[in-house]
Swiss-Prot record:
UniProt subcellular location: Nucleus
Bias (Low complexity): 22-31, 42-59, 66-78, 101-132, 284-346, 495-504
The protein, known as: Homeobox protein 6
Region named Disordered: 22-140, 200-256, 268-348, 483-516
Molecular-function annotations in GO: DNA-binding transcription factor activity, RNA polymerase II-specific; RNA polymerase II cis-regulatory region sequence-specific DNA binding
GO-annotated biological processes: regulation of transcription by RNA polymerase II
Keyword annotations from UniProtKB, A to Z: Coiled coil, Developmental protein, DNA-binding, Homeobox, Nucleus, Repeat, Transcription, Transcription regulation
InterPro entries given in the database record: Distal-less_Homeobox_TF, HD, Homeodomain-like_sf
Location of the DNA-binding region in this protein: 362-421, 424-483
Domain of life of the native organism: Eukaryota
Biased amino acid composition, Gly residues: 32-41
Acidic residues composition bias: residue spans: 505-516
Amino acid sequence: MDKCVITGHHFSVENMNHNNNNYDFDNKNNSIGGGGGGGGSSSSRSSSSRSSSNRSSSGSSGGSGSNSSSSINNIINSDNDFKTERKQTKSPPLTLPNIKTTTTTTTTTTTTTTTTTKNENISSSESENSSSRVGSPNCNKKVKKTKTITISPTGYNINSKDDINKFTTYGYTNEKSNARRDPKWINDIIERYNRLKSESLNNNYNGSSSNNNNINNINNNSNNTTSPCQSPSSNTATITSISSPTSSSSSLSSPSFSINNIVNQDVDENDGCDRMNYTLLSQNNNNNNNNNNNNNNNNNNNNNNNNNNNNNNNNNNNNNNNNNNNNNNNNNNNNNNNNNTNTNNNGDECIVKPISLIQNKKSGQRSLKTKEHKEILEALYRVTLYPTSEETKTISQILGMTFGQVKSSFRHRREKLSKSGLFSYAKNLKNCGKSTAPLDNFFENCKYLTTKETEEFAAAYDVSFEQIKNYFKGKRAKLNKLSSKAIQDKDNQDNDNNNSNNNENNDDSYSDEGLF
């Protein structure tokens, strides 16, 4: 059977030679767990829920093996409808899009491995071309032939093996990891995202050049200037634009960085940059100097306007007054800027608050993801596609989404990847294509399985041992829940009946004596 194991964004298809223990559900002569053997007595396991006729056996000279195997065989073959549902055709092989195959050399990405036995001599050219062959000529050795299948989805590039080992799991995987991950990895991704975005903005500032006149024009023409100490709005996910002496324009281009940098970047704790609070120390003095220059320029403009008013006619006086009013407004704006920056004249650090991704969402409302939400969710998808409940709750709190929205987002991502062939669900009893009627019938007679019976059912359904065990465990839990609810309902009904009887007795206790 071909099994698709996905590691990172590369695929490894392994042809595994299973034991010939697959159960033929259409053949009545088959038995699960072994064939007929010699004479002897097989032990019987006593249980309160099992009948002695089905679970005990006596010795004979021509016995047919263990009775547990025959009982399971009888249960499976007893249902005719179950037999018709078993008939299925072989599933077609998995087709993967954008596949690039090479058969000459081996790589460290993904391999398709088959094991064969060679008795003939291996030529020197073949041994040079296939570096994966083990052994020397004229020896019976197991030879491994490799076939490389490389898939490169758009937007993802894995440069080396070190990138794969950055986190516990990397890339799309179809296994639910039982290992408990440290929930700190979610905060690390958010912090790295904030840090990379701030660094990209700082690089854009440092890479441009301008003069003081452009700064004066920007400060004079903008009425709604923001202080570098001002925090961005809680409903937006962008950093507040900061006026810098090296910037030539008030608008900035969007930063460019990939998801690989968010996930794989190594963070140095002692690099002088706080990942959540970004300090701007030299900005305060520059802002104060610029404001002083603006005040001087405005005073000169006022003097020039006054001289022009004396020389012009009466018709131009109104225009000059309007100019003076505009200059006064500019002075007021500059004074407001000075008031905002006076708090930092003592040498205190001006801290810009980090990006806020929290958006207030109501339950049942569709989540409107921003660009930052999508980039962070994409980085989270690549760590795991099966987040735990604690991780889902943490993500919902950071992104301002509800628990159900985050859960459905991961489920939709898995479905989308499975349709494109980049992700495959692990095989279980639900998608194995076989009915669970024999398991249900067996559960009615016996609520617990032995280890041997569990292995036999796992071989018959071609699933893991734990899946059969968990199936019976879930049915027992459901039965206990139903029984406890039934007992509680019965107790409530008894209490209601007792209360009604007490009320009737109280009504009958009133005597009719004295009425006549």
